[in-house]
Amino acid sequence: MRTLLAARERNPDAALAVAMFCYRARCEVGALAAVLGGMDSLVFTGGIGEHSAVIRQEICQGLEHLGVVLDTDANTAHAPIVSRRGVACVVRVVRTNEDLMVARHTRAVLQGRAGTNDRRQQCKSA
């Protein structure tokens, strides 16, 4: 995504790729909000969601009717809460360790525990 963002001013294909990524994310948020009957929180996580204020901004544009309104300064600073105060939907940025999660899931598969609740298994073995 960093490469696409850096190239989008001079490369229409890069600009289209970024625009489509954000559009599809907005579509998914809207679909989930419809199924859930609204939303009170939107969480950005992972590499792009955690580190790209530009992408968060572009995804959130057009979601104001769902109560999503970003605080530009908080978003740029990668604060834990990047929405304006008092809005209906709190927008959060949550740090993750994706590599650790992949490793844990891989270990569960290799140990034959795929699809089980790891915490429940850990409690039984304690």
Show which residues each predicted segment covers.
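Short, charge-rich patches within N-terminal targeting peptides
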Residues: Q121-K124
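A mobile "lid/hinge" subdomain adjacent to the ATP/sugar-phosphate binding pocket shared
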Residues: M1-A17
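Internal helix-turn-beta structural module
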Residues: D13-V35, M39-V43, G49-G115
